[in-house]
């Protein structure tokens, strides 16, 4: 059975099992039969780069299989091999010889690509630790959108990266986000709605019956008169997942120009809130909590990224507006 898993980097991961009848054959040959949509040369490249695990460990293309092993295929977009170190400040929440945990600011792209050849998190990481040049994708394990802030883990060794990718694929990593959405919700809930790339606008994702499984749990953190602060937890990690799911509920994230539609201002809002909403230039989404098992020590790690100043100011303006509104209503 083939299982589709997370695609945090707009890549994908899949799990399947080696059939018993394949015993004694080369791993790369069996892999080509399990994933016929990819060329054998590409699969061999992924094996060598550490993107494929057999029973949780790295193997060589020529190694034999015995039947019954679990295959993990985790593919992320290639990061430019010519990325250069750049002295870009990093807010490091935790580090040891195996991992960095970064508090990524809004506005910082994770890896170089079209339109962002440098000035990215990868460039900053290579400056902070030149040895990351020897780790696939410079140690990047998962990503955040450019205008989403918050906590990310980066592997400093291939061993750590392999273990963390496996945890992500098997949904052992806990990720909690703070999101400020339009409308005053009365309760939390779960969105179980598959997501795929929009057929015409390739920058967008959309809910679709033919998409990949996507599950988001959300609960109320703070309720205002026309907005709500939510805590969102991911079971899966699809591209733009929280943004797409909240828009699907018709409660788009404040400041989300891709999925939020036109600016929505509360009737009778304070001048401070109106100015804040007009001037909020990114989606109000922050990766606040990351929990995982240390990839080497196997101990639980829990890291909390402080709420950034722009979101604190937005929440303060919402509180003030709500207080004044309800004060007028109660008179």
From Swiss-Prot:
One of its GO terms (biological process) is enzyme-directed rRNA pseudouridine synthesis. One of its GO terms (cellular component) is cytoplasm. It is found in: Cytoplasm. Keywords: Cytoplasm, Isomerase, RNA-binding, rRNA processing. Residues 25-97 form the S4 RNA-binding domain. GO terms for molecular function: 23S rRNA pseudouridine(1911/1915/1917) synthase activity; RNA binding. The active site is at residue 145. Disulfide bonds: none annotated. It catalyses: uridine(1911/1915/1917) in 23S rRNA = pseudouridine(1911/1915/1917) in 23S rRNA. Its EC number is 5.4.99.23. Pfam families: PseudoU_synth_2, S4. The keyword Ribosomal protein does not apply. It comes from the Bacteria. Belongs to the pseudouridine synthase RluA family. Responsible for synthesis of pseudouridine from uracil at positions 1911, 1915 and 1917 in 23S ribosomal RNA. NCBIfam families: PRK11180.1, rluA_subfam. PANTHER family: MITOCHONDRIAL RNA PSEUDOURIDINE SYNTHASE, RIBOSOMAL LARGE SUBUNIT PSEUDOURIDINE SYNTHASE D. This is Ribosomal large subunit pseudouridine synthase D.
């Amino acid at each position: 059975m083939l299982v589709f898993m997370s695609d945090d980097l707009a890549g994908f991961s899949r799990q399947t099992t080696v059939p018993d009848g394949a015993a004694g054959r080369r791993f790369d040959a069996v892999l080509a039969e399990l994933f016929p949509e990819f060329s054998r040369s590409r699969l061999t490249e992924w094996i060598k780069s550490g993107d494929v695990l057999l029973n949780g460990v790295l193997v060589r293309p020529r190694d034999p299989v015995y039947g019954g092993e679990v295959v993990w295929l985790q593919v992320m977009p290639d990061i430019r091999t010519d990325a250069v170190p750049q002295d870009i400040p990093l807010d490091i929440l935790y580090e040891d010889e195996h991992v960095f945990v970064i508090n990524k600011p809004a506005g910082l792209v994770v890896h170089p690509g079209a339109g962002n050849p440098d000035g990215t998190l990868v460039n900053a990481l290579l400056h902070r630790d030149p040895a990351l040049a020897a780790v696939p994708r410079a140690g990047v394990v998962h990503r955040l959108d450019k205008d989403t802030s918050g906590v990310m883990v980066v592997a400093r060794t291939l061993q750590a990266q392999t273990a963390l990718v496996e945890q992500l694929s098997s949904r052992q990593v806990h990720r909690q986000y703070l999101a400020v959405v339009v409308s005053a919700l009365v309760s939390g809930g779960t969105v179980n709605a598959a997501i795929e790339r929009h057929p015409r606008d390739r920058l967008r994702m959309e809910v679709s019956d033919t998409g990949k499984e996507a599950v988001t749990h959300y609960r109320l953190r703070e309720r205002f008169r026309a907005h709500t602060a939510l805590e969102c937890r991911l079971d899966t990690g699809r591209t733009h997942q929280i943004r797409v799911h909240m828009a699907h509920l018709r409660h788009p994230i404040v400041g989300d120009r891709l999925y939020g539609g036109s600016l929505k201002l509360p009737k009778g809002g304070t001048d401070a809130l109106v100015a804040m909403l007009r001037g909020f230039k990114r989606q109000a989404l922050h990766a606040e909590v990351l929990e995982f098992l240390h990839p080497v020590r196997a101990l639980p790690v829990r890291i909390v990224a402080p709420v950034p100043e722009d979101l604190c100011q937005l929440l303060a303006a919402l509180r003030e507006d709500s207080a004044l509104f309800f004060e007028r209503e109660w008179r």
